Amino acid sequence: MTFRHSLAALAVLLLSAALQADEAKPVDATPKMAYGLMMKQGDRLIFSPCRDRSYANVEDVSADGSVTRVLNSVGLDAGKRLYVELLGVLDNGTLKASAFNMARVEGRCQMPGGKEEAWRAAGNDPAWALVAGGEHVRLQRYGKPEVVLPYAEFRSDGNISRYDGANDHARLAVRLDKTICRDAQANGAFAWTASVELNGQILKGCAWQR
């Protein structure tokens, strides 16, 4: 065998080994949050990730198809395009969704909150919004001063997460229950139901993780 033939044979062996390594590479089975737009085409559920031109089929692997039921309640089955945040595993072009964080009709992409945001919550009558993460918990209410308290990681007890904070002027208690919350004004559904108590006033709404 000539030197040239030896190099060619070695190249074939290396290429074969690389292909086998790629084929043997296991799928990361750790569920991660997927952010993107979702629609139904015939019997298929199509997911398009934020800031990405790729597409993936969606397979609902949640218990009793709970993810699909929630999305259909927002309008997926009726042909509406949704912005969704789904917990799942991407496997060979299929997003296997096991849980949902939020879904809104024609909503815009929201990238992960990172270190600055762990939770968001909002409600109506009266209008309010809460952002928790980083160094602060901020509560905004229509026509009233913003309340800012030091952030501390929410305490988890089963399907309930809590936060308590206070300063010289405000005492705040936040309770988040992992039960589906629907907001007709926001045209969406969220994975958590929020109850916020500020100096004895109770505010109700929905919450989602960031």
Kindly label every feature range from the protein language model.
Residues M1-A8:
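Bacterial N-terminal signal peptides that target proteins for export
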Residues A8-S16:
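Bacterial N-terminal signal peptides
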Residues A29-L45, G88:
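Structural detector for short beta-strands of small beta-barrel domains
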Residues T30-K32, V67-L71, M111-K115, R120-A127, ...:
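Charged, amphipathic alpha-helical segments
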Residues G36, G75-A99:
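Flexible glycine-rich surface loops and low-complexity tracts that mediate binding to linear polymers
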Residues C50-D64, A121-R175:
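Central antiparallel beta-sheet cores of small beta-barrel/beta-sandwich binding domains
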Residues N92-L95, D183-A189, T193-G200:
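Short, exposed beta-strand-loop hairpins at the edges of beta-sheets
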Residues G93-G113:
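OB-fold/S1-family single-stranded nucleic acid-binding modules
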